[in-house]
Amino acid sequence: MIPQDIIALKRDDEAIPLDDLRAFVLDYSKGDIPDYQMAAFAMATCLNGMNFEETATLTQAMMDSGETLNFSEFETFAVDKHSTGGIGDKVSLVLAPLVASCGGLVPMISGRGLGLTGGTLDKLESIPGYRTDLSSIELRKVVSDCGCVITGQTDRLAPADKKLYALRDVTGTVSSVPLITASILSKKLAAGVQGLVLDVKFGSGSFMKTVGEARELAETMVAVGTRSGCRVEALLTDMNRPLGRSVGNSLEVFEAVRTLQGEGPADLVELTFALGARMLAMIGVPGDDDTLRALLADALYSGRAFERFLKMVRLQGGDPAFVESPEKLPTASTIDTIPAPNAGYLIAVDAEKVGRAAFILGAGRTRREDAVDFAVGVSDLKQIGEPVAKGDSLARIHANAAEHLEEARVLLGSSFLIDTSHSEPTALIKEKITNSNLSADTFSS
């Protein structure tokens, strides 16, 4: 079938023959189909969606467009976590070495930030020398030596996704559940993971604004991943408030290191343990959820996870001095505070506004080729439920450009809501989704 016929079928919301869809994707990855035709197809998909079989076929074809990794020679199978992105989400930096220190094998292929949500690679690159461009051979060596690696997608790993991701970014076709599903899963499956835990976020600081949107995406990814032979589970987590107390690249690395040293914020530790327990269960570590969390707690508070992170940083070329003494990480030239306008209790923190303030300061990028400022952002965020007196600091703002400071300060100041009545934060983890509890209208395997 010629490309324009496939595009027309999707435009008219008709089913595409699966062999033709697969050939279309593989031809695009080889350069035989131009960007303008794939852009038209992506827009038609964004408008009309895909059925389950089409989504599964798209995912498999994108995975098969390049090389695939295999870790079958290791005693345990490879397991990973993927987050749909949020404000202050530095979980991967803590989770990968934590699970590895409990016997897991974690080859984590991560991405860069775009817009308000930060990228794991940008955060790690605030450690001088840290390499995020490992080849497949280098990746395997790091995993073999320390049990975990956090690196970027290579040109040979799911290249169809790499091309389509860049195209979606500039054609208004990001918000499509089938395209998001195929993008995430093709990379993870190509990286050789046999177990995957998804952190699907909802709320003001995430891509999916409602629980319903997050659930649809989570259920689709669980169903497609399971069909592809991967054990997949998802947690729906609240991103109406920032995660932890810091937003920004080096600031989040600092907080992650402190967490690995046993001094992290409670919400970050809670989410890390929840995801880590599911990863350990997938690789066959015996025990119920409480037992697995206890194993993770022992690895964290004994220092084993920190030592594993330090080893990973060394193996990937990073200077360990910046981990052993994280105060050496890049710092901003100006640090200011946001004072509380009145006394009471903090009852809300708008994650989107906090993320936008950090973005204005230079912590994020508008275009993929833009540079980020590692040093800027927001730290020492007060959290929901905490008491404040008038004039108390609600957050510290870290800036290098004076022209951005005032705009960010005003935006950040408007993100806090104080009331005389005490209010506890809503539950961080909304629900768990597995292949056994998918909605009736989800096509399972």
Predicted ranges, named:
Residues F77-L116:
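Glycine/serine-rich anion-binding loops at beta->alpha junctions
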Residues L47-N48, L93-P107, K187-G192, R227-S228, ...:
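Alpha-helix C-terminal capping segments
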Residues K123-V149, E219-G229:
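A glycine-rich helix N-cap at a beta->alpha junction
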Residues D5, K10, A15-L18, Y28, ...:
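Well-ordered secondary-structure scaffolds
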Residues I109, V143, T151-Q153, I184, ...:
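Short beta-strand segments
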Residues M1-G88, L260, R308-D319, S444-S445:
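Acidic, glycine/proline-rich low-complexity segments that act as flexible tails and inter-domain linkers
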Residues S92, S110, T117-D122, Q153-T154, ...:
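Short acidic, glycine/serine/threonine-rich loops at helix termini
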